[in-house]
Amino acid sequence: MRLPVSLFLLLGFTPIGVFAQSGPAPVIAAARERQPFKIVLVGDSTVATEGGWGPGFCATLTPNVRCVDLALNGRSTKSFIDEGAWQKALAERGQYYFIQFGHNDQKPNPKVHADAATSFQANLRRMVSDVRAQEGIPILVSSLSRRNYVDGRPDPNDGLADYAAAARQVATEERVTFLDLYGLSTKYLAGLTQEQADGFDMAGHADAKAENGSAAKPDRTHLNEAGKTLFGRMVADNVVRLQVELGPNVVGVAAGSGAAFPK
């Protein structure tokens, strides 16, 4: 599927952050000088290696960066903490933590549900505090959009907008860098048709089978290799506009530009 480059360029200049934090000086200096450092990704299946943007993002980084994708299928902020996955992530002692949840927090299952206005925000604040306590830099990322269309546009009633707004609110109040992937991906998908967007669908993801009861239905949540590459690049090319010291560590992107997308 050929993608309209003009949309990428437009997105590259879209304001997406509410606050660009500075962070601990040694961490910033290491990134600017391309010394070895670690980025840890935490989140749900839309970040995870099997069907998320994480691998595509990690592939954009220079060899001095160790990118560790610890996102887990089916997890929410609540279950990620409750099951001990968050403590394992902290044990990595990363310099940067990219944190994206929402897809499972919105589900009614009490094992994963976290209310957008209350517990979801409390869980994000805990994660931000924990990362800062060990002198790391947290970056909050809103959820990747689903690819279900209504009347030729991405479905505005997917329930993720409330969680994106909640993440933005936490970022503003905690003075944390916020990357609005939900807004970016929704805007990009608005320029495609359902048929074109289905070109990113993954076949056979375990979460999709569990939810749909069959692997035959389209999986418009998880990503195939093309989707991983595209949306991973979207994250990389835009986060360097907010954490500008990361620019030298992303292949093909001038520091702070956020304008280079695959053609």
Question: Which stretches of residues belong to each language-model region?
Answer:
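Serine-esterase "nucleophile elbow" of acetyl-processing enzymes
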Residues: A20-G74, S79, G84-R93, Y97, ...
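Short, charged N-terminal helix-start/capping segments
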Residues: P15, R32, K38, N157-A166
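Bacterial N-terminal signal peptides
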Residues: P4-G17
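Alpha-helical cap/lid subdomain in secreted, periplasmic
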Residues: E83-G252, G258-K263
